[in-house]
């Protein structure tokens, strides 16, 4: 290329060269840069060149810069280097047109332009550098008509190996590397017209800037650089420094195909807008002076420069633009971070778009300025290192946020805040963004052609309220935008935008900003307002469906996408200088009047969970319900596709208007062991569906209280009983403890049998007790007892002594079966001696029950031992005689020792707890449910109120009142009733477990009485865990009858002497002092 075409064109060419910063050195007379074309730089020319002696005739555009001299000087070396030397870049034009073959014509205008423009820029730069170029090259330099859209490209463009000289490989050919091949460029860039226009404009505008002289590091710099480094080879070292960001890039590397460099380099071109490699080359032209000397450095300053760009620029710059580029490259080298990474072709192709932003400005800027701009871009968009095959600096691709990454720490730099579609948590650390008042579920959005319909209202009146918790140091902005409300991840809504509302009634300040084409409303959160804001300044604007649907890549349909969410986001400053980003979205808001009138809407539903067996009735309340409405339950997999879908059975006769009653269908997998969340929705047709609501299926076992199950065989190994204690406030002492019977699973179970045993042991202990403080006998009519859960705590054994009771009952049946010992003649009250001390553990195993000493330190305080189990248990501190009546099998009454425990100050009076079961059956039979060890354990704590009698009606069918143990505990100085409610088998894996007879809250103050009628429970006792599967009621009756026959009358008399008969009043059901 010669300076013959210089002049106005030369100036343009120079500018273009700088902008392109990659103009290849003018090829030798025989070589013609085919890839140069007036893409982005005015200095680029497309020429039909008569085949010079060394070149094939090919139209091509050459910069007017003085690149020829460099090219001529460097071309030999370049050819020798086989494209590995940056010098070769200067000579690239030659190699492009080298004898290897004439440049291959590309019929794709955009591609030709792209390829040509980089080369042209470079070549123009070379001309501006006053490099000597053959006349044919000058001809090439002549501005070709815009009609010449294609340029024959030499194979060297695509394959550096094709061009004999390294320089040629470096030239635009190099930028036509595999990644930057015209084909790739062609498919990357499709707006040929715009590119042509840009190229034409840059012909006139870019050349001045492109010219080396015009640029800070003009041709003189390039020449100087050449002088410093001598041949192109010397330039290559320099080039690599310039590419320092890519300093690691070797001549081979940058010469190696840089597919993406061409496209990505487009940003480098002054016409950054050009998406074609030519554009990149043009930009490189501006950078080319620097790039050519140091192709990689030149591009590195333009971290955004792609392989093609910096290769072309470097090649052309090395040849003609080298000097000018050198200074430019030097600056670039310093400007571009050393860590700059080369991007892949794709990245390069994408990046040009970013670079376009500054391409126009850069076109008018001097090469140095362009370089700085490019550098800024490069630093802003770090380059990504490609495989060894792509060792070129590609234009950094714009940073694009990938799809939501759940679990990502929401800490961001202020310079790179997350995009609006980035998922953020609502709570992190001590900070939480919260919507205190949700918006209404319907708000009619207004169109652009109509007036505002006001701000979004709240369902409770007023407006939504948003508050930030955990931070109040200084005011921050609350950002609000309209987001989607579909099943996909949250993102800005395509068809709705937030609309700022102003007026006298608006109390909240706000301002609108645009973030990525989305309108965002900024509302201040002030510490004086407790970091809270009422959103009375936000309306919803509906965009035209056609405007959105016609957008490239838009797949949503406006009329089917009318639900939105109000999305709020804050960026909280952190001490590190970064920000913590939080985001919260409101409930879905329907913005279409038609949809609001036609689509069903579920406002509430009666239950939100049930067992996997289903069958429960659910009442759904809402609007737009029709007689033919259906409710569908479905479960979605991780991929969002339905895995299970079933229709709920609607009970039509119970449905009324806005209420639908349905039967929850069973879950498809009843064997689940954990709760499963599904969804349900109401539909009036295929396209009219309500929002999905959540529903939970729970395993059957989840409805039961899980308690460790202890095999009876392992029970004896338990060393210490665990008395159950329930603490509750007391009127005088503060808390009392109630001992109760415990069920194995703490489930309420009704006992079909008519009796429950009071004492479970192979031998009934002989108990001789006398009541010193209470003259009134306590009578208990056995009946099923409710076992309620309570806190079980171990207690130390209580030592006590007692006189053996004369009544000795031998039990020959199963050791686990309880025995009720009583007189078969009449009511025998067994009075337990209160001041007798309990001195040891009572072993209630298979061996005869040892004497149990009971001691009461306080008069009037009583304790009761409900059951003795085969386990080793601590006996209760105090025992109280309790009489119970039996009207079955000829036994009038049975007296069984019942330990009534008290801990604390004496109670003023003990009240009998009476139960009136309606079972029919033999008098004292052990209920299988009661076979579990039952024990009342002492309860620690301050004095508790006294127990009041509690009437109990057994739900079981029957007419006779059958004996069953009842517990009565009283540990208190004053009387606060301990209420016992419920029924069920007395089955507990541990003999030391007791359940409180009633909820602590139910205890009234002193003197007050409460009568509770427990609801019947139809659950059968669980014998599987009891070990009584083979025991029948008949066996129990036989055993009890046999044992009772062994009781001597004398023993019964002795007991009766010690304990006076109970008064008839105490036998009445439900009668007590407090009742």
Swiss-Prot record:
Residues 236-253, 724-739, 887-912, 970-981 have a biased composition (Polar residues). A motif (Nuclear localization signal) lies at residues 273-275, 686-688. The modification N-acetylthreonine is found at residue 2. Ubiquitinated by STUB1/CHIP, leading to proteasomal degradation. Phosphorylated by NFATC-kinase; dephosphorylated by calcineurin. The modification Phosphoserine is found at residues 344, 372, 1063, 1066. A motif (Nuclear export signal) lies at residues 1032-1041. It comes from the Eukaryota. One of its GO terms (cellular component) is nucleus. Keywords: Acetylation, Activator, Cytoplasm, Developmental protein, DNA-binding, Nucleus, Phosphoprotein, Repeat, Transcription, Transcription regulation, Ubl conjugation. Residues 18-37, 205-306, 711-739, 887-988, 1049-1075 are annotated as: Disordered. Residues 415-596 form the RHD domain. Residues 109-114 are annotated as: Calcineurin-binding. Rel Similarity Domain (RSD) allows DNA-binding and cooperative interactions with AP1 factors. Acts as a regulator of transcriptional activation. Binds to the TNFSF11/RANKL promoter region and promotes TNFSF11 transcription. Binding to the TNFSF11 promoter region is increased by high levels of Ca(2+) which induce NFATC3 expression and may lead to regulation of TNFSF11 expression in osteoblasts. Plays a role in promoting mesenteric arterial wall remodeling in response to the intermittent hypoxia-induced increase in EDN1 and ROCK signaling. This is Nuclear factor of activated T-cells, cytoplasmic 3. It comes from Homo sapiens.
